[in-house]
């Protein structure tokens, strides 16, 4: 049952990411800024051919290799830890897998990643839902591993 819940959750997360990108591409012109939540969040449709902060632009082969490695390692640990009672560890791996798949789908389908979320209150890169999954997933993974080590596991 746990496998089904995790698989369905991952599919829903990837679907949410892809749906958000679909709406941005359909309804916002490239480079246009649309106020979403005033003074908090704007939507800006960008095509990112690089990684976070557009580093390593146009290196699709590199991102493909890195994505396969990261997804493979995350899947391996998710399967290995499937019976664990550590919710945070499973959640972190699920978010990392979902975020990686969301951006990987873009790279395969479009040749770039659709970014759109712009935080108006801070000078920060424009990102997408999958990037959020990855960031939160990595943060949760660090916390989960730190707690495991602290508990002597």
Curated annotation (Swiss-Prot):
GO cellular component: plasma membrane
Active site (catalytic residues): 115, 131
Organism: Streptococcus mutans serotype c (strain ATCC 700610 / UA159)
UniProt pathway: Protein modification; lipoprotein biosynthesis (signal peptide cleavage)
Bilayer topology annotation: Multi-pass membrane protein
EC numbers: 3.4.23.36
Predominant location category: membrane
Any one GO molecular function term: aspartic-type endopeptidase activity
UniProt entry keywords in alphabetical sequence: Aspartyl protease, Cell membrane, Hydrolase, Membrane, Protease, Transmembrane, Transmembrane helix
UniProt-recorded name of the protein: Lipoprotein signal peptidase
Statement: the UniProt record of this protein carries the keyword Hydrolase: yes
GO biological-process terms attached to the record: proteolysis
Pfam families: Peptidase_A8 (PF01252)
